[in-house]
Amino acid sequence: MTELINTYRGAVMQWHCDQMGHMNVMWYVGKFDEATWNLFAMMGASADYLRKEGKAMAAVDQRIQYRRELLAGDTLVIASGVLEIKPKVITFVHEMRHATTGEIAATCRLVGVHMGHTTRKSEPFPQRILDAGKSLVRSYDFGERV
């Protein structure tokens, strides 16, 4: 298995925490989203590309597994990889770890569709983005990990 690629590094702030004292689920989603845009940029599907070419990406499936609480002051890192890329659809994974202990805090599997911004209809990725995405394909075991 080829290693996942680091796509985000950050910290849990006090205002990210809920009444139970740990990072609220909305912040997991937000941090995974930031990792997504870094992964897309590595493929050439950056926000600049989307704006200039009149394209968009739509998330059509997102599955998060929460494994360990993160608390205010904890640092975290997200590593990502493409699981599969087809002409119009990409499936990818994010793995969020506590940066100090290395423990997995959460995993996220997403499916995205490349589309026209105004037509809102799926369209093929340009070949260069498809090729770049293929170079980032990784295998990933969503089972119990240490």
What feature does the model see in each segment?
Residues 1-77, 83-146:
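Terminal targeting signals and extreme-terminal segments of soluble enzymes
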